[in-house]
């Protein structure tokens, strides 16, 4: 079986995967409001209801690459209880899942397989990059490791750490739910590529910059 790793080209045609399916467009609810106040408001309410259901019933795919996967599975245990966020039903097949966590080191030989699994997932679908290795290659600055899974997959949330704690994974999951709640998709019976409005999600590092600057006493690692 032959695999081919495809790099994202922003200048490529819309038919090329995954640019065509991940196109960012203007909010369709705004156009509806201008054309028809009642229908626009109704669609806005329906979009909120649909997004509420989507963000509170994520179906994760049971997939892991390295040590970060151990931290991710720890979030499913009783002390952390990921069931509070509606994402505890792990699926064994990507065709039954809409949410994937790339947890661990992504090697060149594994990248086409990850891309194939992503293509088999249900729409709409989301991806979290968990850990330094998945985000940027981590300490493996070598030819055999992909320096960031966003080179061949669209990523919704990045979780830093080596490895991140389960609490960090839960925070990333809540950020993903916040992003899903602000999405706007066409509500129609049409099946196919449809434009998606995604709100800009600012970096948590920039949001908490002032808070970090005001810190005067730094705690030791065993006190965190």
From Swiss-Prot:
PROSITE patterns: COMPLEX1_20K (PS01150). It is found in: Cell inner membrane. It comes from the Bacteria. One of its GO terms (molecular function) is NADH dehydrogenase (ubiquinone) activity. GO terms for cellular component: plasma membrane; respiratory chain complex I. NDH-1 shuttles electrons from NADH, via FMN and iron-sulfur (Fe-S) centers, to quinones in the respiratory chain. The immediate electron acceptor for the enzyme in this species is believed to be ubiquinone. Couples the redox reaction to proton translocation (for every two electrons transferred, four hydrogen ions are translocated across the cytoplasmic membrane), and thus conserves the redox energy in a proton gradient. This is NADH-quinone oxidoreductase subunit B.
């Amino acid at each position: 079986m032959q695999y081919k790793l495809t790099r994202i080209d922003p200048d490529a045609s819309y038919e090329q995967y995954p640019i065509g399916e991940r196109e960012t467009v203007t909010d369709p609810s705004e156009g509806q409001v201008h054309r028809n106040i009642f229908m626009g408001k109704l669609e806005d309410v329906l979009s909120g209801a649909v997004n509420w259901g989507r963000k509170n019933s994520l179906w994760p795919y049971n997939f892991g690459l390295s040590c970060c996967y151990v931290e991710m599975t720890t979030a499913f245990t009783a002390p952390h209880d990921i069931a509070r966020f509606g994402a505890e039903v792990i699926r064994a097949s990507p065709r039954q899942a809409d949410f994937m966590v790339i947890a661990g080191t992504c090697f060149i030989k594994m990248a086409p397989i990850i891309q194939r699994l992503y293509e088999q997932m249900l729409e709409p679908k989301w991806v979290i990059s968990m850990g330094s290795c998945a985000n940027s290659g981590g300490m493996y600055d070598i030819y055999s490791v992909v320096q960031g899974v966003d080179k061949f997959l669209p990523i919704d949330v990045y979780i830093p750490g080596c490895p991140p704690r389960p609490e960090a994974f839960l925070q990333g999951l809540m950020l993903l739910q916040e992003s899903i709640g602000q999405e706007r998709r066409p509500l129609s019976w049409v099946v196919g590529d449809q434009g998606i409005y995604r709100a800009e999600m600012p970096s948590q590092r920039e949001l908490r910059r002032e808070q970090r600057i005001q810190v005067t006493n730094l705690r030791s690692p065993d006190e965190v």
